[in-house]
């Protein structure tokens, strides 16, 4: 069994660049593969097992935000009227669904990557995004913090491990974290 990593791979007809992780099938069948886009919020765009993609590729021209498995952070759900407070401190977000703000700030941001790894039958990739003073994303949510995800692919599976780190010693970090996978209907309804 073996695993592999290919960087700078095109995603279908979109031209988006991805990192492809794959793990060989022990029985000699098709490998398990994922494609992840660091520039699209570290979105898991594809998860293929035995030739079947379990993630919706989406309509790249009509609805490019309805694809893959976007990461939603630090506010994964609705923020009513784009306003919230935590520990008496107000936060304001630009509404993006009527008067409300949804799905956080990282889903279309560029993430930084560690060198990918392979070990026997697994391939992994660790990526992170930092909210640091001077970065535009920090201006939208001004508490220094880092979100990290590690994708690990083994035959038949993909695993995501998370780390949220508060880098600001003076205040607590309010956050929520979610993924929003778009799964296809496979087989009859």
Outline where the language-model segments fall.
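Surface-exposed acidic/polar loop and edge beta-strand patches at domain peripheries
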Residues: 1-189
């Amino acid at each position: 069994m073996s695993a592999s990593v290919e960087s700078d791979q095109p995603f279908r007809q979109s031209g988006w660049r991805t990192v492809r992780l794959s793990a060989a099938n022990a029985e000699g069948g098709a490998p398990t593969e994922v494609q992840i886009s660091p520039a699209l919020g570290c979105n898991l765009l594809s998860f293929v097992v035995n030739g079947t993609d379990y993630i919706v590729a989406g309509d790249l021209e009509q609805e490019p935000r309805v694809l893959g498995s976007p990461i939603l952070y630090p506010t994964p759900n609705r923020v009513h009227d784009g306003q919230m407070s935590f520990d008496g401190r107000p936060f304001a977000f630009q509404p993006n669904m009527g008067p409300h703000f949804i799905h956080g700030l990282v889903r279309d941001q560029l993430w930084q990557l560690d060198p990918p790894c392979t070990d026997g039958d697994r391939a992994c990739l660790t990526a992170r995004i930092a909210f640091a003073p001077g970065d535009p994303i920090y201006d939208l949510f001004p508490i220094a913090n880092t979100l990290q995800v590690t994708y690990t692919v083994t035959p038949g599976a993909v695993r995501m491990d998370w780390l949220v780190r508060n880098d600001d010693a003076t205040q607590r970090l309010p956050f929520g974290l979610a993924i929003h996978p778009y799964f296809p209907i496979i087989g009859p309804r």
